[in-house]
Amino acid sequence: ADGEGRLGDTVAAYRAAVAGADAILLTTPAYNGTMSAVAKNAIDVASRPRGAAPIVGKPVLVAAAVYSPGADERVLEHATTALRIAGAKPLERTFGITKHVEAFDEAGLVDKDRERELQALVADLLSPVPVS
């Protein structure tokens, strides 16, 4: 099923890393109005094998960096939906950055309020019971 007998070392190592993680921070750009294929594939690979998927029950903070205003909401919704279907436990709150080209400088996020917001979300993710 799903070609499980032909897994490479990279897939096995990735699944082991997901299994060993206390929590996951999934970040993605927007491509054609949704998450990147790499982010989607990361969710899909961690959702297998059925019955022993390493992503099941993992708390996940979803973050997206996009250019177009409003596009972050679509990307975050798509990623959160895929994670829930895969059995993960995405936080209710997500983090989106629009006009990402202008949002960062060499030191990080330009908007220090947004930086504090992200830090609080990561703290929630890493708390024993994630706050949604």
PLM ranges: what are they?
Residues R6-A86:
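Helix-loop-strand module that forms the ligand-binding subsite of alpha/beta enzymes
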Residues E4-L7, V11, D111, E115:
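Flexible, glycine- and charge-enriched loops at secondary-structure boundaries
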Residues K89-S132:
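Glycine-rich phosphate/pyrophosphate-binding loop and the adjoining helix
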Residues A1, N32, S36, V56, ...:
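Generic, ordered loop/turn and secondary-structure boundary motif
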Residues A1-G8, A103-A107:
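N-terminal beta-loop-helix "entrance" segment that forms/cooperates
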